[in-house]
Regions:
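Topology signature of small-to-medium multi-pass alpha-helical membrane proteins
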Residues: 2-141
């Protein structure tokens, strides 16, 4: 009889990972942590944690509320997907990053004052593309 533990192949086999693949997984986990913090920040805004009196979630304009709920959900979903190094995690995170940059650039009156997020998100996207390409180059055909 076969041992069931030897039949199951790990999702990410350590013996066949290259240097850039390990770096990619590390990068994805770091970005997952950042996405988790961003998602929790938005949930704190929804829950009113740290908000001055009179500036609760329902006192803010509807566009701010909708955007905050969107990022509260998508950032946490992206964090899970990135942590698992799943392909859908990268797609969800790229959607969140591009959406955040778009909101900051095109609608500064909604969140306003955080233009530093645009180059930060852009730098992370460029780094993601670079590390992903390097990891793909080291895989055998």
């Amino acid at each position: 009889m076969t041992d069931p533990m030897t039949v199951i192949d790990p999702a990410h086999g350590r013996e066949q990972e290259g240097l850039w693949t390990r770096r990619l997984v590390l990068f994805l986990r770091i970005v997952a942590g950042l996405s988790l913090v961003k998602g929790l920040y938005h949930w704190a805004g929804i829950a009113g944690i740290g908000a001055p009196p009179g500036e609760a979630f329902d006192a803010n304009p509807l566009p701010w509320q909708a955007t905050t709920v969107f990022f509260a959900v998508i950032d946490l979903v992206a964090a899970v997907g990135l942590w698992l190094a799943a392909a859908w995690g990268g797609v969800v995170w790229l959607t969140a990053a591009i959406s955040m940059a778009g909101v900051e650039l095109l609608f500064p009156d909604i969140f306003g004052g955080r233009l530093w997020m645009v180059p930060a998100e852009l730098a992370l996207v460029v780094a993601y593309i670079g590390v992903t390409l390097m990891a793909a180059r080291e895989r055998p055909e």
